[in-house]
Amino acid sequence: MPLNLPDKLPAIELLKEENIFVIDTSRATQQDIRPLRIVILNLMPLKITTETDLVRLLSNTPLQVEISFMKIKSHTSKNTPIEHMQTFYTDFEQMRNEKYDGMIITGAPVEQMDFEEVTYWEEITEIFDWARTHVTSTLYICWAAQAGLYHHYGVPKYPLDQKMFGIFEHRVLEPFHSIFRGFDDCFYVPHSRHTEVRREDILKVPELTLLSESKDAGVYMAMARGGREFFVTGHSEYSPYTLDTEYRRDLGKGLPIEIPRNYYVDDDPDKGPLVRWRAHANLLFSNWLNYFVYQETPYNINDIE
């Protein structure tokens, strides 16, 4: 089914080249159904890349989906053209009276800072609280998952001795949970982070359910409020060459970086990546949209509370 994207968003042409079905707003207005309203708070530096990664996965949906992009006022993006931000992004203050069927909050390159030291911490925690009464289900990814767990439930994060970098095997702890419908017993997820949350801290919080973990990468997914909040520590949305780009970037800067684990064919960067996470990434996002957004959201969006 199609995604309804803002007219002229760069991701439209990129995804059409991949045979992904998208339509722009002009065409969507001719279809007489209520689309699911999804807002994305994109905190990643390379915003166009992240937009494309997420939109690619959101395209596999049962209904028309209308995508909006939110930005925070207390931070200015240095890696995305200002014209792009002005055209496609809206400040939270201008969106606070809106309601949405679903929300995705991305990671951010601030994980090695204490949460309270992040310049936009006050604003983003206000958004976390706002989402609880204005969004049917919120998907927190990577740093946002750590930040949401800390803000809502007091779960701390811990520095890692070595960056968690590569593709790791995970297991499903709740096999009959709807978020895992169609999943294999084990599945693969990209990780790229310097910090972690720990299972013992998750298990101490009665409101949290630990859904998936990895013997190497640790906690992968936790849920709260009956599926109104999901906290995902990995990057299922990553495209095939994202880790390769990060690896070569850090090599070029002379930073200490290991080859991403379980990623390249024969662990040889010259042979390219072996993609093992794409199918489960699509299942994750389609299951979230279907079972926790579409099936749960009221027809009258103003009834969300």
Swiss-Prot record:
Biological process (GO), any one: L-methionine biosynthetic process from homoserine via O-succinyl-L-homoserine and cystathionine
Positions of substrate binding: 163, 192, 249
Protein keywords: Acyltransferase, Amino-acid biosynthesis, Cytoplasm, Methionine biosynthesis, Transferase
Residues the record marks as active site: 142 (acyl-thioester intermediate), 235 (proton acceptor), 237
GO cellular component: cytoplasm
Enzyme class at the top of the EC tree: transferase
SUPFAM superfamilies assigned to the protein according to its UniProt record, in alphabetical order: Class I glutamine amidotransferase-like
Pathway(s) where this gene product acts: Amino-acid biosynthesis; L-methionine biosynthesis via de novo pathway; O-acetyl-L-homoserine from L-homoserine: step 1/1
Subcellular location: Cytoplasm
NCBIfam families: metA
Official protein name in the record: Homoserine O-acetyltransferase
Record gene name: metAA
